[in-house]
C-alpha cells in the first residue's frame, strides 16, 4: 500500500509541475493506482527513468559474450553433462589476447560463460568435481574466471558472468532445495572472490538434469545474493534490469521502448500479467499508449541484443569461413545500438584458448569502422540540446559541401523516454526532402539513407509524450564496404542420394555403396517446426543399424536456427543412414526433407 500512496502523491506533484516548474522522476518501476486515467498513466510513463546501474550499462553500448568451455572441445552447442573434465585442455590459453581483441573492436565489457548447461565450471569451485580443477589444463591449477578478470582489470574493461541455472551434470538438479543451495554457493564464489562484477546473466533454460527431473529455481534467493554481494551489477534476461530483445539474430525493434509493462520473471505474477496484456519478450509492441493504458504497472526494462559473430555460440573449426562480414556486423550495430539497445556480441575462443585470427581481424575492422564513421560530425554547430513538444522542429546547418548518409539522435533518458514519432529532412537545392523517419529514439537512434549534401537538416518531433529532451544530434558519412561475404560448402554429399527409401523416419541409400562417414549436417527451416531431439543411425546392409554418436539433440536450435554440424568421434563405414526425429522444437515430431541433410566425408 505504501507504493500506491507514493505514486498518488507523485502524480499530484507531476500535475502541479506546470505551476511550480518542478520536475519529478521515478526510477525503474511504477505501480498504477486502479483509479488512474490513461492520461495520468502516460504522464507517469514519461517520468520513468533508469537506475544509475541501468544508465551506466546503457552507455556501454558494446559488450562481448565469451562462450568457452567443454563444448569448445566436443564440437557441441549444448553438452549433456557426461563429458570428462579432462577434455578441457586449451593449448595456448591467453585471456589477455581476448581482451585486447575486444578493446580493438570498441567493446566495453566482457561476459564469460562461467558455467554452461553441461555444468562444467571454469573456476575451481568447491561445489562440484566437474570443473577446471579436474582438467589437464594447468595441471588442474587453472582458473579461467580469474585470468579473464585480471586481464579485464588491466585493460580497463568491465566484467560480467553468465551462470547457467540448468545443470545437466549436477546429481541434485531436480531436488529443488538442494540444487538451489548449490547454485547459491556457486554465485557466492563468483561474486565474492573476483572483485567487482558489472553484469550477471541468467537465461531461462530449464531442461532435465541427469536424473530426468526438472528444477524449480529459487530466483528470489539468487537475486538476493547478487544484490548483497554486487549491488552495482545489472541482472540480465531472467533479472529485472535488462531484458532479452527476443531473438538471437542481432535484430532490434523499429519501435523499442525501454518503458514497458512487460514483467520480468522476478515477479510471481509475471506469466499471468504478461498473458493478460498479450505480450512476451518477442512481442513487436512493448510500450505503446494502448498497452500502458491497460497496464497495472510499468518498468524501465531496456533491451539487450545478443548475437554471435559466427553461426554457433561455441567455437567450431568448420565455421572459420563463416565469421560475419564487416558489413553484417555494422548492420547489427545499427539495428541494436542504433535502435535503443545494447549489443552483446559473442566471440567464442578456439581450442587453443585464443580468439581465432579471423574473428580478431574482423573485430579490429569493426572497431575502426565505427570509430572513423562517428569521429567526424558534419554539423556546423555542436550545441544540440533541445526541449521540444508535439510538432516542434529545429534546423541545423551542415558544413559546406559535406556529404552525409547517417543521422544520430539521442534522448536524455535520465529525464525519461518520450519521443513517439519523428522525421528527418534535408534542405537540398532549396527544397526540404525527407531523408528518414522513425518512431522511438531512446538512448540512441541511428538512421541511414542515400548519400546527400544538404545545406541543413531539419528534425521534427511529430508525436511526443509531453515534452521531450533531445540531448544529441549528429550527421555523419558512413563509407561503403569493399568486402564480400564468405560462403562455405555445407556438406560434402548434399541431397545427391542414390535413393530415398522412406520419409518417416528418413531412410536413405547414400551412394549405392559403402562410403566413409565422419558426421552429418542438418539445415533447418525456421519457417516450420524444426527437429530438436533425434536418433541418427548407420547401416552397411539396411538391416543391422548402429548409432555412431551419443549426441541426440540439436542444442539451442530453436533460438539460433543455423546449420548444425554433428561430427562423430570415429569415422564410420556405411551405405545407409536413418534419421528419426523424436521431438521437435514445438513438441511435435516434424518430418525432415532429404535435402536438409548432408553427409560429412572428410
Each language-model region and where it sits:
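Asp-box/BNR beta-propeller loop motif
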Residues: 1, 427-433, 539-548
Amino acid at each position: 500500500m505504501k507504493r500506491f500512496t507514493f505514486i498518488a502523491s507523485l502524480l499530484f506533484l507531476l500535475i502541479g509541475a506546470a505551476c511550480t516548474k518542478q520536475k519529478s522522476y521515478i526510477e525503474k518501476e511504477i505501480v498504477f493506482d486502479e483509479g488512474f486515467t490513461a492520461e495520468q498513466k502516460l504522464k507517469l510513463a514519461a517520468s520513468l527513468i533508469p537506475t544509475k546501474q541501468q544508465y551506466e550499462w546503457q552507455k556501454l553500448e558494446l559488450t562481448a559474450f565469451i562462450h568457452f568451455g567443454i563444448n569448445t572441445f566436443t564440437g557441441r552447442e549444448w553438452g549433456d553433462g557426461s563429458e570428462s573434465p579432462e577434455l578441457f585442455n586449451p593449448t595456448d590459453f591467453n585471456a589477455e589476447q581476448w581482451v585486447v581483441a575486444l578493446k580493438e573492436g570498441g567493446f566495453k565489457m566482457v561476459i564469460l560463460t562461467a558455467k554452461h548447461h553441461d555444468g562444467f565450471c571454469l573456476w575451481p569451485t568447491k561445489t562440484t568435481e566437474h570443473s577446471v580443477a579436474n582438467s589437464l589444463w594447468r595441471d588442474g591449477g587453472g582458473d579461467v574466471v580469474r585470468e579473464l578478470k585480471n586481464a579485464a582489470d588491466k585493460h580497463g574493461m568491465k566484467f560480467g558472468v553468465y551462470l547457467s541455472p540448468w545443470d545437466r551434470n549436477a546429481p541434485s538438479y531436480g531436488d529443488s532445495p538442494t540444487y538451489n543451495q548449490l547454485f547459491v554457493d556457486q554465485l557466492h564464489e563468483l561474486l565474492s572472490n573476483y572483485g567487482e562484477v558489472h553484469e550477471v546473466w541468467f537465461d531461462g533454460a530449464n531442461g532435465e538434469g541427469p536424473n530426468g527431473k526438472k528444477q524449480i529455481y529459487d530466483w528470489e534467493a539468487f537475486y538476493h545474493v547478487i544484490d548483497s554481494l554486487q549491488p552495482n551489477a545489472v541482472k540480465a534476461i531472467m533479472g529485472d534490469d535488462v531484458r532479452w530483445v527476443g531473438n538471437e539474430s542481432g535484430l532490434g525493434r523499429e519501435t523499442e521502448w525501454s518503458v514497458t509493462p512487460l514483467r520480468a520473471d522476478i515477479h510471481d505474477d509475471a506469466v499471468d500479467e504478461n498473458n493478460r496484456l498479450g505480450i512476451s519478450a518477442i512481442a513487436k509492441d512493448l510500450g505503446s499508449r494502448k498497452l500502458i493504458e491497460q497496464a497495472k504497472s510499468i518498468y524501465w526494462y531496456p533491451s539487450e541484443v545478443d548475437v554471435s559473430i559466427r553461426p554457433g555460440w561455441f567455437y567450431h573449426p568448420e565455421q572459420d569461413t563463416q565469421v560475419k562480414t564487416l558489413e553484417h556486423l555494422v548492420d547489427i550495430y545499427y539495428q541494436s545500438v542504433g535502435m535503443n539497445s545494447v549489443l552483446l556480441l559473442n566471440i567464442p575462443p578456439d581450442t587453443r584458448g585464443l580468439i581465432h585470427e579471423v574473428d580478431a581481424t574482423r573485430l579490429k575492422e569493426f572497431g575502426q569502422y565505427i570509430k572513423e564513421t562517428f569521429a567526424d560530425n558534419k554539423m556546423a554547430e555542436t550545441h544540440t540540446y533541445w526541449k521540444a513538444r508535439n510538432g516542434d522542429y529545429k534546423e541545423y546547418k551542415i558544413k559546406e559541401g559535406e556529404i552525409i548518409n547517417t543521422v544520430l539522435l539521442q534522448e536524455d533518458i535520465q529525464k525519461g523516454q518520450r519521443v513517439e514519432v519523428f522525421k528527418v529532412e534535408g534542405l537540398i537545392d532549396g527544397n526540404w526532402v525527407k531523408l528518414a523517419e522513425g518512431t522511438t529514439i531512446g538512448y540512441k537512434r541511428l538512421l541511414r539513407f542515400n548519400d546527400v549534401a544538404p545545406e541543413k537538416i531539419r528534425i521534427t518531433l511529430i508525436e511526443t509524450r509531453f515534452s521531450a529532451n533531445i540531448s544529441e544530434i549528429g550527421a555523419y558519412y558512413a563509407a561503403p564496404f569493399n568486402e564480400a561475404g564468405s560462403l562455405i560448402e555445407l556438406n560434402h554429399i548434399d541431397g545427391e542420394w542414390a535413393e530415398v527409401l522412406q520419409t518417416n523416419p528418413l531412410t536413405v541409400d547414400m551412394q549405392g555403396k559403402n562410403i566413409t562417414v565422419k558426421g552429418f549436417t542438418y539445415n533447418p527451416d525456421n519457417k516450420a517446426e524444426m527437429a530438436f531431439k533425434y536418433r541418427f543411425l548407420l547401416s552397411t546392409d539396411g538391416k543391422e543399424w548402429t548409432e555412431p554418436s551419443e549426441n541426440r539433440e540439436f542444442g539451442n536450435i530453436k533460438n539460433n536456427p543455423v546449420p548444425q554440424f554433428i561430427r562423430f568421434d570415429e569415422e564410420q563405414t556405411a551405405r545407409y543412414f536413418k534419421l528419426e526425429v523424436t521431438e521437435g522444437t514445438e513438441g511435435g515430431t516434424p518430418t525432415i526433407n532429404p535435402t536438409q541433410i548432408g553427409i560429412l566425408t572428410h
